[in-house]
């Protein structure tokens, strides 16, 4: 194979996924490893190198893109990621460059998703949009005039830690009331136990030992009144917050990414409704809510690899 390829790497607290794709988003190889099996980042880099070498694609790799928690674009480091076994500041981009001898770009996973949408997905026709990643937590990547906003230190876009409820739910960051404690898979599950509802005692949710967000959405579709209230509340918190975010970002669209976003069009429609109700008049009816077009199974690798093509363009 003589086609130029980018190696995309998504570092997760549980699993890390890596794969090879071309500038059109065609995936040629993908594999997942258990992150915690590697006591040091050097050992993980060695593993990925040997796998890419073994499948015969090493000469085709023209660059490496990495999406990682607390990833800093400017320094190429992972900084104090709470969900990783490796502590402190990890110079991961430098480790990959030393091993592979190619340019390596690192940023956080939400920023990688935003670039992925711009290169391959729902943001291909947009120059100003915000990707909202809805997973265990909530992240965001802000694209303005076709460029990702990193801020002065590489950590712009921590939208999940905007406080939406004064003295609200305790967040993993140590603060209270952060958006991701309400709008995320974890936030949806917390609402089962924390929302005061006259319908809670008759809901099937109460009988679930370890409920998941996907079950809440499914029960809402089936008409469970308490589940409907939870989804409505989640959409309202997000919609109101997006209306505030619009005041200083003024995007053409918000692109919802992740499991919650893929739960069905009704959630996005609810978010849109609450956002419109809360928007200033100058922004009304101007902003779209779109669903990610990146295939959920390959989204992490595509997002990471897109960093390479964006840098080379």
Question: Which residue ranges define each predicted feature?
Answer:
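ATP-binding/phosphotransfer module of carbohydrate and carboxylate kinases, centering on a glycine-rich
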Residues: 1-63, 73-77, 93-102, 119-126, ...
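Conserved A3 ("GATE") glycine/threonine-rich loop of ANL adenylate-forming enzymes
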Residues: 14-15, 112, 136-139
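Residue-level detector of high-confidence beta-strand sites
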Residues: 30-32, 81, 151
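A generic structural motif
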Residues: 33-34, 85, 155
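A charged helix-plus-loop insertion that forms the helical arch/lid used to bind
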Residues: 77-89
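General beta-strand structural signal in soluble alpha/beta enzymes
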Residues: 104-108
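Glycine-rich phosphate-binding loop of actin/hexokinase-like ATP-binding domains
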Residues: 126-182
């Amino acid at each position: 194979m003589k086609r130029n390829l980018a190696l995309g790497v998504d570092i997760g607290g549980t699993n890390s996924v890596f794969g090879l794709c071309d500038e059109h988003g065609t995936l040629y190889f993908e594999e997942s490893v258990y992150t915690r099996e590697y006591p040091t980042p050097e050992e993980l880099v060695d593993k990925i190198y040997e796998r890419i070498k073994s499948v015969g694609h090493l000469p085709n790799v023209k660059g490496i893109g990495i999406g990682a928690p607390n990833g800093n674009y400017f320094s190429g480091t992972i900084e104090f990621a709470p969900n990783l076994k490796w502590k402190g500041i990890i110079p991961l981009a430098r480790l990959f460059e030393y091993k592979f001898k190619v340019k390596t770009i690192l940023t956080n996973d939400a920023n990688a998703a935003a670039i992925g949408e711009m290169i391959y997905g729902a943001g291909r026709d947009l120059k100003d949009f915000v990707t909202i990643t809805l997973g265990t937590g909530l992240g965001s990547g802000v694209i303005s005039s076709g460029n990702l906003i990193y801020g002065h230190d590489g950590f712009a876009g921590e939208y999940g830690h905007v406080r939406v409820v004064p003295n609200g739910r305790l967040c993993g960051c140590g603060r209270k009331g952060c958006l991701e404690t309400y709008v995320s898979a974890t936030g949806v599950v917390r609402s089962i136990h924390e929302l005061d509802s006259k319908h809670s005692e008759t809901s099937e949710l109460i009988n679930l030992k370890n409920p998941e967000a996907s079950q809440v959405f499914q029960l809402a579709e089936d008409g469970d009144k308490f589940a409907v209230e939870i989804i409505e509340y989640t959409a309202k918190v997000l919609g109101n917050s997006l209306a505030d975010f619009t005041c200083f970002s003024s995007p053409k669209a918000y692109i919802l990414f992740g499991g919650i976003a893929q739960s069905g069009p009704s959630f996005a429609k609810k978010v849109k409704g609450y956002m419109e109700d809360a928007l200033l008049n100058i922004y009304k009816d101007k902003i779209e809510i779109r669903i990610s077009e990146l295939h959920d199974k390959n989204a992490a690798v595509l997002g990471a690899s897109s960093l390479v093509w964006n840098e080379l363009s």
